[in-house]
From Swiss-Prot:
Protein name: Translation initiation factor IF-3
General function of this protein: IF-3 binds to the 30S ribosomal subunit and shifts the equilibrium between 70S ribosomes and their 50S and 30S subunits in favor of the free subunits, thus enhancing the availability of 30S subunits on which protein synthesis initiation begins.
Species this protein is from: Prochlorococcus marinus (strain AS9601)
InterPro entries, alphabetized: T_IF-3_C_sf (IPR036788), T_IF-3_N_sf (IPR036787), Translation_initiation_fac3_CS (IPR019813), Translation_initiation_fac_3 (IPR001288), Translation_initiation_fac_3_C (IPR019815), Translation_initiation_fac_3_N (IPR019814)
Keywords linked to the UniProt accession: Cytoplasm, Initiation factor, Protein biosynthesis
Gene: infC
Sequence similarity: Belongs to the IF-3 family.
Signal sequence coordinates: none
Subunit details: Monomer.
Biological processes per GO annotation: ribosome disassembly
Length: 190
């Protein structure tokens, strides 16, 4: 048996931001805190201007020629960046797979409840796994379950598209629906 891999127990090396004395470029294009261009300035002169205003010199674009620096309050800038990142994480929605279970002999009201649940899941951007459960000898009627799932897909046609057609999996029959990206346009007959 091969030896177990060893894990590096050292703390990860964090990249320090290029501010003030950490900036190593001799010539910099400097923008002040109001967004006004100060032009291409020597690094020491730019640091002097920043210290006179009691602000920091922050490297904004390293790839430009010459590199672009901005005179600003770095603590405030860092706080704003963290706030933006937090908002972006909050807004990003992880798609989940929600499940709607039923039997092939389902009553009208129960079926309508399952359709309502599936609609709610699809509108919130989640995928839906529709499952028909068989017990005992009911598995002989898998054609009725497939018909039920296809009817469900047809009823949810405006909100969803079939990702996986009905198929048997053990003692169940399943079908996957995913939210429709573009609204379905129905054609008029006549």
């Amino acid at each position: 048996m091969p030896p177990r891999p060893r894990f590096d127990r050292r703390a990860p090396v964090r990249e320090l931001p290029n501010i003030n004395e950490r900036i190593k470029y001799p010539q910099l294009r400097v923008v002040d805190s109001d967004g006004k261009q100060l032009g291409v300035i020597d690094r020491l002169k730019a640091l002097e201007i920043a210290s006179q205003r009691e602000l920091d010199l922050v490297l904004v674009s390293e790839k430009a020629n010459p590199p672009v620096c901005r005179i600003m309050d770095y603590g405030k800038y860092k706080f704003e960046q963290e706030k933006k990142a937090k908002e972006a994480r909050k807004k990003s929605h992880q798609t989940e797979v929600k499940e709607v279970k039923m039997r092939y002999k389902i009553d009208k009201h129960d079926y309508d409840v399952r359709i309502g649940q599936a609609t709610k899941f699809l509108k919130s951007g989640d995928k839906v796994k529709c499952t028909v459960i068989f017990r005992g000898r009911e598995i002989q009627h898998s054609n009725l379950a497939e018909t039920l799932l296809l009817k469900m897909a047809n009823d949810l046609e405006e909100q969803s598209e079939v990702q996986q057609k009905p198929k048997r999996e053990g003692r169940n029959m399943i079908m996957f629906l995913s939210p429709r990206k573009t609204p379905l346009i129905k054609k008029d007959d006549g």
